[in-house]
């Protein structure tokens, strides 16, 4: 997503945007959401929710994203891996780890 894309989302009345690299496998050479975030937050922060998706593996990554202007983070793959490896207990453990790190 570019700054212009984010501005357009605000113009058409979107309530949120998601910065994602689609698991880093869809577009060869795509920019990291963390790299895009500061410029996009400067351009549209406060006008639209900014959800960072991609590269979030630890609680410290959540703190970094929030400090750069995100209003939320997505952590889907982490929960799926935890569920597959450890079932409900695995998900509970990863939630505890994330909370402890934050």
Language-model-detected regions and their locations in the chain:
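Internal helix-turn-beta structural module
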Residues: 71, 87-102
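Alpha/beta enzyme core
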Residues: 1-52, 59-82, 96
């Amino acid at each position: 997503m570019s700054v212009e894309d984010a501005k357009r989302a605000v113009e058409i009345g979107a309530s949120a945007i998601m910065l994602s690299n689609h698991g880093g496998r869809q577009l060869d050479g795509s920019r990291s959401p963390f790299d895009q975030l500061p410029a996009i937050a400067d351009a549209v922060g406060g006008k639209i929710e900014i959800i960072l998706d991609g590269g979030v593996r630890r609680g410290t990554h959540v703190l970094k994203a929030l400090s750069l202007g995100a209003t939320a983070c997505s952590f889907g793959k982490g929960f799926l891996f935890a569920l597959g490896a450890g079932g409900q207990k695995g998900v509970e453990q990863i939630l505890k780890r994330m909370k402890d790190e934050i």
